[in-house]
């Protein structure tokens, strides 16, 4: 038996976040549901696909306003997406849920009434246990930046599963996050404020992407706890648990060449938009390839589509060191890298026509983007 009445708008927001952990393709039918657990002073929502689990605690009051009135404690598992769709379409400002001993659930709001067949919550798998010791703490803003600056570079191919995740290495109180799909590499470094144990884990890119969606742009802190095969992110009323990927992440430090041939500074926005325009033809050509040549403090970008025509763009460069160079690259990779650099001025280092090149913010080594060129010249 369970009964409570809750503010509908608040409930919808929390249900939407819980739903992000639920996959229709699960092998366990009960995991397509949301577990609802009404306790004396709070309601807990749980969603899981066995890879990612999200647990959200709804307190009785938020900022002095009553959110939920709990008449009787109890639990039930309700069909996730169907239940959320019902709550979204209900007419009233409040929703009342009550269950009987067979987990039949009555949902009422305004003049609407739904009866849903619930499942026994005791059949719902237990969430992984993650020790609350030895946390690292970041601000939500910083974590969202880390995800934006690395996660796009993970591999989407399952042939090397470790590359579908981001490597988080904690060493000497520095956090180094690395992602690569073998064609490009993104690295973000951060000095940690508190003493932290050394760690080397791989967090699935999909999990970080879902976590990013449910974190609001706030100055809140997020606590991150690691277990042998799980990671827990705790922020506000949300616990987000993800399975870690097994295996050894490749040593990517050897990919960075030494002694650049050419180094130049360039305006991030000008460079990005020029590549964006040139990529219109590159995409039509079917290969996303843009040719770049340097000389006379100019960067020239060009692309050709046999059916449509050609495009040429010029962007001013500054602080140019070295001679001239021609190189070709994937326009999408370059635009992703520039988007990840949160700085108006970008430094680009070239090491040769067929060697990887590096982009980073001017006078800042905390973000590094590496891209492998394409052989066209």
UniProtKB/Swiss-Prot annotation:
Subcellular location(s) per record: Cytoplasm
Domain of life: Bacteria
The UniProt record lists the keyword rRNA processing: no
Keywords linked to the UniProt accession: Cytoplasm, DNA replication, DNA-binding, DNA-directed DNA polymerase, Nucleotidyltransferase, Transferase
The keyword RNA-binding is assigned to this record: no
Alphabetized Pfam families for the sequence: DNA_pol3_beta (PF00712), DNA_pol3_beta_2 (PF02767), DNA_pol3_beta_3 (PF02768)
Family per record: Belongs to the beta sliding clamp family.
Classification via CDD domains: beta_clamp
Name this protein carries in UniProt: Beta sliding clamp
Function: Confers DNA tethering and processivity to DNA polymerases and other proteins. Acts as a clamp, forming a ring around DNA (a reaction catalyzed by the clamp-loading complex) which diffuses in an ATP-independent manner freely and bidirectionally along dsDNA. Initially characterized for its ability to contact the catalytic subunit of DNA polymerase III (Pol III), a complex, multichain enzyme responsible for most of the replicative synthesis in bacteria; Pol III exhibits 3'-5' exonuclease proofreading activity.
UniProt-listed GO biological process terms: DNA strand elongation involved in DNA replication
Any one GO cellular component localisation term in the record: DNA polymerase III complex
Assembly notes: Forms a ring-shaped head-to-tail homodimer around DNA which binds and tethers DNA polymerases and other proteins to the DNA. The DNA replisome complex has a single clamp-loading complex (3 tau and 1 each of delta, delta', psi and chi subunits) which binds 3 Pol III cores (1 core on the leading strand and 2 on the lagging strand) each with a beta sliding clamp dimer. Additional proteins in the replisome are other copies of gamma, psi and chi, Ssb, DNA helicase and RNA primase.
The organism of origin for this protein: Staphylococcus epidermidis (strain ATCC 35984 / DSM 28319 / BCRC 17069 / CCUG 31568 / BM 3577 / RP62A)
GO function terms (MF aspect): 3'-5' exonuclease activity; DNA binding; DNA-directed DNA polymerase activity
